[in-house]
């Protein structure tokens, strides 16, 4: 476990598909940067790609992370690797992320109760739930899919008692940026929050 764990809180973003998780993460990183703090981002889903690439030397990790067409060529093998890895250890990617955390951290894709339960044993996660109404989600490309939208990865963290903060994303990106700044300021006001790198 990294020295970072237990000493500081980790921000974790939870939310439905097309709620704006990645956008909020980017805005939080930008807000932290303006205050001289490097906020590193981690994703459990991304960790499966890292581990897959480590096991397959012919796979280019950078392209797997950022090149959609390239990722599609490897999707069947990546999916099989992910399923097999999770069957062997449901926390394999969570543990891998926590071993790498060495700085103020933002987890961008908290989805499952057992992920949160594990985080609570090794650090102090602060769960930020981002919400967005269906009209705005649809404007970004969301369409209800009963298979995806009722899957446990979309619903396990619907209980508000699991959230520390709620960010409503029903306006512009500029409005969301204001929420991100306020959220970061509240986090930094805590005695155990990270301080400026400057």
Task: Give names to the regions the model predicted.
Residues 21:
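Conserved lysine of the Walker
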Residues 91-92, 130-198:
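Small-molecule kinase domains that catalyze NTP-dependent phosphoryl transfer to phosphate-bearing small molecules
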Residues 30-40:
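Post-Walker A helix-loop "phosphate-sensing" segment adjacent to the P-loop in P-loop NTPases
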Residues 15-16:
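P-loop (Walker A) phosphate-binding loop of NTP-binding proteins
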Residues 24:
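Hydrophobic positions on the alpha1 helix immediately C-terminal to the Walker A/P-loop
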Residues 43-105:
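ATP-dependent small-molecule kinase phosphotransfer cores
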Residues 95-143:
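ATP-dependent NMP and nucleoside kinases share a basic, alpha-helical "lid"
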